[in-house]
Amino acid sequence: MLVLTRKLKEAIQIGDDIEITVLVIQGDQVKLGINAPKHVEIHRKEIYLAIQAENNAASFASKTSLERLTEQLKHLKGGKQA
C-alpha cells in the first residue's frame, strides 16, 4: 500500500484522469474531492461492498431461476407438464 501525506487543499493524481483533493479536515474526519471521468464509479468502501453483495445475490437468484426454467422446459419438451 502506498501511503501519502497531504495537507489541506493539496491533491493526489492517479493516472491522467483522476485527482483527489483534501477539501476539509475537521477533527478525525477528512473530506475529499474527487475529479474523475463520468464512467469511473466512485463509492465509499462500505457502499461498494454492499453493491457487490447484492450483485452476487442477484446472480445466484438468476442462476437458480434459470435452472428451474430449464427443468420445466425439459419436462414440456418430453410431453410432461411441470
UniProtKB/Swiss-Prot annotation:
GO MF, one annotated term: mRNA 5'-UTR binding
**Cellular component terms, GO, for this chain's entry?**
cytosol
- What compartments host this protein? Cytoplasm
Keyword terms: Bacterial flagellum biogenesis, Cytoplasm, Repressor, RNA-binding, Translation regulation
Intrachain disulfide bonds? none
State the superkingdom: Bacteria
Q: Name one GO biological process term.
A: regulation of carbohydrate metabolic process
Mind telling me which Pfam families this protein's record contains? CsrA
- Which InterPro entries does this chain map to? CsrA, CsrA_sf
Q: Does the keyword Transmembrane apply?
A: no
Q: Does the keyword Metal-binding apply?
A: no
How is the quaternary structure described?
Homodimer; the beta-strands of each monomer intercalate to form a hydrophobic core, while the alpha-helices form wings that extend away from the core.
* Function text: A translational regulator that binds mRNA to regulate translation initiation and/or mRNA stability. Usually binds in the 5'-UTR at or near the Shine-Dalgarno sequence preventing ribosome-binding, thus repressing translation. Its main target seems to be the major flagellin gene, while its function is anatagonized by FliW.
Q: Which HAMAP family match?
A: CsrA
Q: Which family does it belong to?
A: Belongs to the CsrA/RsmA family.
Q: What is this protein called?
A: Translational regulator CsrA
Biological source species: Geobacillus kaustophilus (strain HTA426)
